[in-house]
A protein has these predicted regions:
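N-terminal low-complexity, acidic/polar interaction/targeting segments
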Residues: 1-134
Length: 134
């Protein structure tokens, strides 16, 4: 499990989510991302000043174009690499920690979306990763 997250109880109860079709993060894997939209730049800033956690999740066909429906399952990633470019973009790498079921979406005042994740079904993800490394 990524640094500091040895069990699901170590993970935050609320997470920002980055709905991005075609980008899949799995526990123990890495996902490089180029962040350029202002709302997601803000999300990364907030993540870097806190838990360094971002939930990657796919979208489904429904919902508004600017607020698409979220898939049921995503994966929490920890920002393990971070760089700023001269033109204002961020280059980050997320390392997958644990899958989650997207619970209640919070009605909040941030430009990005946040959910209350349910890690229960995937509580063994951190242990599975550790076992593979041994």
């Amino acid at each position: 499990m990524a640094a500091g997250y040895r069990k699901v109880t170590d993970l935050p109860e609320l997470i920002p989510v980055f709905p991005l079709d075609g980008a899949l993060l799995l526990p123990g894997c890495q996902l490089p991302l180029q962040i350029f939209e202002p709302r997601y730049l803000n999300m990364v800033d907030d993540a870097m000043s806190g838990h360094r956690i971002i939930g990657m999740i796919q979208t489904t066909g429904g919902g508004d174009r600017t607020r698409p429906s979220l898939a049921e399952v995503g994966c929490v990633g920890r920002v393990t690499a971070y760089a700023e470019t001269g033109d204002g973009r961020y280059l980050i790498t997320l390392t997958g920690v644990c899958r989650f079921v997207a619970g209640d979406e919070l009605d909040i005042n941030t430009p990005y979306r946040q959910v209350r994740p349910d890690y229960g079904r995937f509580a063994s993800d951190p242990d599975d990763e550790r076992a593979q490394l041994q």
